[in-house]
Amino acid sequence: MAEVNVRNFNINFGPQHPAAHGVLRMVLELDGEVVERVDPHIGLLHRGTEKLMETKTYLQAGPYLDRLDYVAPMNQEHAFVLAIEKLLGVEVPKRGQLIRVLFSEIGRILNHLLNVTTQAMDVGALTPPLWGFEQRERLMIFYERACGARLHANYFRPGGVHQDLPESLVEDIGNFIDPFLIALGKLDALITPNRIFKQRNVDIGVVSIDEAWARGFSGVMIRGAGVPWDLRKSQPYECYDEMEFDIPVGKNSDCYDRYLIRMEEMRQSAKIMRQCVDRLLSTEKNEPVSSLDRKIVPPKRCEMKSSMEALIHHFKLYTEGFRTPPGEVYVAVEAPKGEFGVYLVSDGTNKPYRVKLRAPGFAHLQAMDFLTRGHMLADATAILGSIDIVFGEVDR
């Protein structure tokens, strides 16, 4: 009997699929149930963020950063304000640095809780999201108490943070850590030894160290390949060089390793949070939270009620903004998903000439074809869950 040429089967995955993690559309080419090719279609959440930021003053551009990786908003703001401070040569007081580090680590836990639990849900486990989101809700309340917003914070400002934390909030964050570690242990015991979860993740989506470097991987994706590359250690910023924490690395470079690294990173983040809380309540208790350079930091409201100059200063700062010296800087932070970078070009005016945002998820999604080729169709959802995609930052 003559051999019949069977054409490969093309299907659409998303953009309405619950496992697509946002508005991802992937065109999958299948040979039976084996994936031959993956073509991710992006741009469904493109809002022209970089261009919009060039039309706003440095203070007005800040909130756009919250809308990129909206799972952990303050981590993006961190990179932008560090870039502005590098241009201006401004030093942030130690208390301001500690508050920034504290909320960056809260953001990391927010991100990893969402990712780990939804990764488990993608392969059929329904309990982890219910447990994980209970802890996330507590952290969102800390966000709300710090700046008034649960999601779009706009809390990190050039020169420091918008306002000091009440002592009761710092104490409550400290009291949150131990119960959280117990809850994390229960989540760990539920997912990690689970036979089905292992079968769906072990030896799936393997990437070598050389391939990971060549494809621009960062964060958990590069550490999963066995490289201890973490910007908090390798290029320390703020007061990370004064913190004690470890960097978990994988050895098999598969989806299961990436899950284990995220679980351990949450424990390390809790460790950093505890160190920040201890210092905020003792040695750095009554220190300022923002730079004393009043060119970029607005005056206090109590000053504005009595001083005409303070009122004029406040008005000028929020209408015209401040000017930065001409130049260009690139600043990267270790965001929960990887290296989030801001390339800022200033022409000496009160608005950035060019802002380029380097989103880690973009490089990771590009590798989807390479990671999924040769796997089964069902493995595509497991791989997508493990690379941790949020479309706000991919599409920008």
From Swiss-Prot:
Its EC number is 7.1.1.-. The keyword NAD applies. It holds the Pfam family Complex1_49kDa. It comes from Bartonella henselae (strain ATCC 49882 / DSM 28221 / CCUG 30454 / Houston 1) (Rochalimaea henselae). This is NADH-quinone oxidoreductase subunit D. It is a peripheral membrane protein. SUPFAM superfamilies: HydB/Nqo4-like. Gene3D superfamilies: Cytochrome-c3 Hydrogenase, chain B (1.10.645.10). GO terms for molecular function: NAD binding; NADH:ubiquinone reductase (non-electrogenic) activity; quinone binding. It is found in: Cell inner membrane.
